[in-house]
C-alpha cells in the first residue's frame, strides 16, 4: 500500500458515464455468453443471459452498469448487453480486479443523491 497515491478525487476524474445502446428481450438469442442487464436491482441487474446478438450493442467487460430506476451500480466482469434505462460507467484509470468491490461501494454511495435527480439528467 506504500506505492499507492492516496488523495481526494472527483468521481468525474476517475469515471465516464455513457449511454448504452439498448434493445428489448425479443432480440435475445439462445446462449449464456453475455448478460442482459436491465434497470432492476435483483440478481445484480441481470434479467437473463443471451448468446451473441450484434457487435454494435455490446458493452465491454471491466465497466459498471447503472440501472436508472433504482440507481444501483454493478461491476461487469464480462461483455454485456443492456435494456432500456441503463448507463455504463467506464473507468478512466486502470482498476485492478481486487479493487472493483471497493469502487462498487464508492459508486453505490451516490445512490441517495442520484435518486433525487431526474433520470434524463443522469449523464
Please tell me what each predicted stretch does:
Residues 1, 22-26, 92, 112-117:
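Short, recurring structural edge motifs at helix starts
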Residues 1-44:
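Non-catalytic DNA-recognition/assembly elements of restriction-modification systems
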Residues 5, 99, 120-123:
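Amphipathic alpha-helical segments
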Residues 9, 34-36, 75, 81, ...:
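Sequence-level detector for tyrosine residue identity
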Residues 19-22, 44-46, 73-74, 109-115:
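Short loop/beta submotifs within extracellular cysteine-rich repeat domains
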Residues 46-105:
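A short beta-sheet element
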Residues 87-90, 104-123:
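Specificity-determining recognition surfaces
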Amino acid at each position: 500500500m506504500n506505492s499507492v497515491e492516496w488523495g481526494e478525487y472527483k468521481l468525474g476524474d476517475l469515471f465516464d458515464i455513457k449511454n448504452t445502446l439498448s434493445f428489448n428481450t425479443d432480440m435475445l438469442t439462445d446462449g449464456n455468453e453475455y448478460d442482459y442487464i436491465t434497470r432492476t436491482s435483483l440478481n445484480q441487474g441481470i434479467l437473463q443471459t443471451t448468446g451473441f446478438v450484434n457487435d454494435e450493442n455490446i458493452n465491454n467487460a471491466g465497466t459498471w452498469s447503472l440501472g436508472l430506476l433504482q440507481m444501483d451500480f454493478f461491476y461487469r466482469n464480462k461483455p454485456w448487453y443492456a435494456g432500456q434505462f441503463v448507463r455504463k460507467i467506464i473507468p478512466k484509470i486502470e482498476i485492478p480486479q481486487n479493487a472493483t468491490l471497493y469502487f462498487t461501494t464508492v459508486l453505490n454511495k451516490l445512490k441517495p443523491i442520484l435518486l433525487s435527480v431526474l433520470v434524463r439528467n443522469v449523464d
